[in-house]
UniProtKB/Swiss-Prot annotation:
Spermidine binds at residues 36, 85, 168-171, 327. This is Spermidine/putrescine-binding periplasmic protein. Its main location: periplasm. It is found in: Periplasm. Keywords: Periplasm, Signal, Transport. GO terms for biological process: putrescine transport; spermidine transmembrane transport; spermidine transport. It comes from Escherichia coli (strain K12). The lineage of its organism: Bacteria, Pseudomonadati, Pseudomonadota, Gammaproteobacteria, Enterobacterales.
Amino acid sequence: MKKWSRHLLAAGALALGMSAAHADDNNTLYFYNWTEYVPPGLLEQFTKETGIKVIYSTYESNETMYAKLKTYKDGAYDLVVPSTYYVDKMRKEGMIQKIDKSKLTNFSNLDPDMLNKPFDPNNDYSIPYIWGATAIGVNGDAVDPKSVTSWADLWKPEYKGSLLLTDDAREVFQMALRKLGYSGNTTDPKEIEAAYNELKKLMPNVAAFNSDNPANPYMEGEVNLGMIWNGSAFVARQAGTPIDVVWPKEGGIFWMDSLAIPANAKNKEGALKLINFLLRPDVAKQVAETIGYPTPNLAARKLLSPEVANDKTLYPDAETIKNGEWQNDVGAASSIYEEYYQKLKAGR
């Protein structure tokens, strides 16, 4: 998931303090999730149905979640929601445990096309919760969407000082790497450097970086073109801002937020029950409608309104997904990306 607003940070920190005192209690479950990622009343519904009380705390980046799990090694959390390549990183480091899918009676509701991704083959360690993509956002009132077909178009001089980029090193570099014909998951220092040099050429066109909610600058009229998350664009359209999503010919950037059980979780059985609850069609529908991002749950998608379920910006066709690329862990190369990214922003 991508970072949203920061107004829940203090609440998340308070809940974190409670979770540090995690008791070995099968009637209590400690759930650490992204902000604004669970509909109001949903966890209370789970408690009513199962008798398991959920202590809920939130984070706004994978880095924060990862650091907390590294810090609290006594089993502070029972369920977490890492994104794409963090699933890969955490399973390789032994931070999350294998999931007994035989206890997930609702697992069959998931779209087979959303399973068995490179970051977790066979979904041994993670269960899809929400997915999304980064593509090109276009304010149709200001820019003809048909005039933009590729990431490369963002480099045109006519867009000087008018673009928005997400404030995410991997995403920004993945865009440039795809433009150059490389994998967005490359670990080759020369290819990453080439992307950095390509991005330096783009900087005169960049007006802002935003990963709190990249639709906001479009809605405020600050930008009319740039990177966008498809769910963020959908929410903006619902609010009246005409943001079109263009799937670049070089391919979109796909990510998934998945449910995972920490290796030292104290209430594994409770975590499995909550995962199974969240896989229920009626529940997954609530989640998708609340946060505005696509659900990987086919049974839930059938319950959505046709307007939403058939929206190709939310649910692109198989060819569009195949042409894109899922983010994966790049290991030690992540520091190379971050170093170049900071240089890029400092040199604006």
